[in-house]
């Protein structure tokens, strides 16, 4: 049995867009999480384990942080909540 190829086309963009308000929100959300994952691996290399949260889905060291972030969003491990800014007086 051949495993399903994973990458930027998996999970499908339509499934990801159902989790957020817009494409822009998806890009910002996924990129911020990918940066956290990247920082986690850098901290792991330096011996510091408690500064960042690692991947919340099964992944290997070869998986790109952005792909891991997309899988986390698709599996509802992360939820985007809009920031409500106070009204100007």
UniProtKB/Swiss-Prot annotation:
The keyword Acyltransferase appears for this protein: no
InterPro entries tied to this protein: DNA-dir_RNA_pol_omega, Pol_omega/Rpo6/RPB6, RPB6/omega-like_sf
Keyword hit for Transcription: yes
Gene Ontology molecular function: DNA binding; DNA-directed RNA polymerase activity
Source species, domain of life: Bacteria
EC nos: 2.7.7.6
Catalytic activity, as annotated: RNA(n) + a ribonucleoside 5'-triphosphate = RNA(n+1) + diphosphate
SMART domains: RNA_pol_Rpb6
GO biological process: DNA-templated transcription
GO CC terms: DNA-directed RNA polymerase complex
The entry's keywords: DNA-directed RNA polymerase, Nucleotidyltransferase, Transcription, Transferase
Function, in words: Promotes RNA polymerase assembly. Latches the N- and C-terminal regions of the beta' subunit thereby facilitating its interaction with the beta and alpha subunits.
PANTHER family hit by this protein: DNA-DIRECTED RNA POLYMERASE SUBUNIT OMEGA
Subunit architecture: The RNAP catalytic core consists of 2 alpha, 1 beta, 1 beta' and 1 omega subunit. When a sigma factor is associated with the core the holoenzyme is formed, which can initiate transcription.
Cross-referenced HAMAP family: RNApol_bact_RpoZ
Similarity annotation: Belongs to the RNA polymerase subunit omega family.
Protein name: DNA-directed RNA polymerase subunit omega
Lineage: Bacteria, Bacillati, Actinomycetota, Actinomycetes, Micrococcales
């Amino acid at each position: 049995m051949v495993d399903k190829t994973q990458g930027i086309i998996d999970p499908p963009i339509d499934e990801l867009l159902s989790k957020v308000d817009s494409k822009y929100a998806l890009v910002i959300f996924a990129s911020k999480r990918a940066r956290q994952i990247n920082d986690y691996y850098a901290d792991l290399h330096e011996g510091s384990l408690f500064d960042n949260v690692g991947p919340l889905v099964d992944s290997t060291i070869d998986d790109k942080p952005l792909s891991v972030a997309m899988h986390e969003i698709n599996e509802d491990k992360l939820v985007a909540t809009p920031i409500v800014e106070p009204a100007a007086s």
